[in-house]
Every structure is written in structure tokens, then in C-alpha cells.
Amino acid sequence: MQELIACVDHIRFDLELAVEQQLGAQPLPFPGMDKSGAAVCEFFLKSACGKGGMCPFRHISGEKTVVCKHWLRGLCKKGDQCEFLHEYDMTKMPECYFYSKFGECSNKECPFLHIDPESKIKDCPWYDRGFCKHGPLCRHRHTRRVICVNYLVGFCIEGPNCKFMHPRFELPMGTTEQPPLPQQTQTQQKQNNNQVLQRSSSLIQLTSQNSPVSQQRSPQTIGVMQSQSGNQGNRGPRPLDQVTCYKCGEKGHYANRCTKGHLAFLSGQ
């Protein structure tokens, strides 16, 4: 009723023009400031903003569907360059880690989204086509539907709005792209283990063939090692005549037995 009696759609105030044209907007003192509470730059959406990083308004690029979790804690350093949304929107919050990991969240006022795990499971394209070899072990959802009789005959007037199932006979993916059965994976693992055992046995045979040469050379090497170990074992402490104290510079005692102090080397200069 108010629009019929006193319609003001044809009236344009000077304030509206100033806001649209950003009249009086001062540039930022330095780039990189927090502009989370500022409005969206209308010129940037039209690719006509010449202020760049000094613009006091937010520069939003693309469609941002998820709120930045670092911005929620005040730790996001990307500013306008962030690929996530810097805006508190409950419908675009990121997914709750605890609910997705453990199936429950103890926080009653959790701001993050609690998505049902069942809704994440996709329909099995092979089962929708008619048959899935994985059966109940398939990781995709097997939904039983009633086939539309009219579609099987040749034509259904309901089209995509039909409440019955319209089967699709083309292959959803390559025949080799479907994940293998658990039995097939077990057999492949056994084959790989057998190959490893065969390789190890062949290496053992090669080493056994070369063993006589090593046995012929082993006594000489053993004698050398024994002589070296014997020389090291007979080595005892050096006589005191060959020991030089690094504190006083005299021979005949170790530094830990020196009685002249740590400045004794200055007396000899």
C-alpha cells in the first residue's frame, strides 16, 4: 500500500550516488590491512578498480563457497587474495572435523557444519545399470528402484520427472577402471610375495656360488685383522716422559694433575 500511495523508486538521493561511485573514500595508509568489515568494491567486480591493494573495500574474486577457518580465528594473512570467504555465513561454514572423523561432536554450540556421512556416499553407477560385482561390499550406495515400464517399451511421457527408474545402458566407466574385488587383491599380493621370494632365492644361489673365492681369501684377511687387533690390544698408556701438559707446557704430567693453575703458561713467556 505504501508503494502505491508514496512510491519513491524514481527518486535518487545524492548519498546513493556517492556510495555507488565511492566518493570520498580514502585509500588505505598501507596495503595488507584487515578489510573484513568493509563493503565489497563495486568497481573491482567490473574490473575497473585502479586502487589495487590500497583500496579500502574488499576485492572478492570468484565464487567462494566456504568460510576461511583461519579468518574465523583472526589468523588469515592473505586478505583479499584468500580463496575462501571472509564472511560469517552459517550456511557456508567448513565441515566439522570431529563429526566427520568420529561421527559425533561434543560441542553443543559448534559453528561448523555437521554433514551426515550417508549423504556423502554416491550411488553406484554399475548397480544403476543393472549389476555390480562387489555386491554388499561395494563402497557406493545400492538403491533399489522400480523400473519404468513405459521407458522399457520405448517412451515415457513423464521424462526426468518420472517417479520410476529410467535405466541407463551405457557403461559408466571403463571395464578396467572399476575397483577390483578383495579376493583379486589378495591373489595379487600373493603373486607379488612369490616373486620376491624367487628373487631372494636366486640371490642366495649366486652368493653361494661365489663363496669358495671368499673362503680362499678369508684366512689372509683374518690374519691381518688379528694382527691389527693384537697391536691395538698391546698398546698401553703412554709414558709420562712423552706427555705434555697444555696448561703449563711442561712434560711429565697430565693437565688434570697440574698444580700451577690454568694461567701457568703465561709465566714461561
UniProtKB/Swiss-Prot annotation:
The keyword Zinc applies. Residues 173-239 are annotated as: Disordered. InterPro entries: CPSF4/Yth1 (IPR045348), Znf-CCCH_3 (IPR041686), Znf_CCCH (IPR000571), Znf_CCCH_sf (IPR036855), Znf_CCHC (IPR001878), Znf_CCHC_sf (IPR036875). Gene3D superfamilies: Zinc finger, CCCH-type, Zinc finger, CCHC-type. Signal peptide: none annotated. A zinc finger (CCHC-type) spans 243-260. A zinc finger (C3H1-type) spans 35-61, 62-89, 90-117, 118-145, 146-169. Keywords: Metal-binding, mRNA processing, Nucleus, Repeat, RNA-binding, Zinc, Zinc-finger. GO terms for biological process: embryonic body morphogenesis; mRNA processing. Belongs to the CPSF4/YTH1 family. Component of the cleavage and polyadenylation specificity factor (CPSF) complex, composed of cpsf1, cpsf2, cpsf3, cpsf4 and fip1l1. This is Cleavage and polyadenylation specificity factor subunit 4. It comes from Xenopus tropicalis (Western clawed frog).
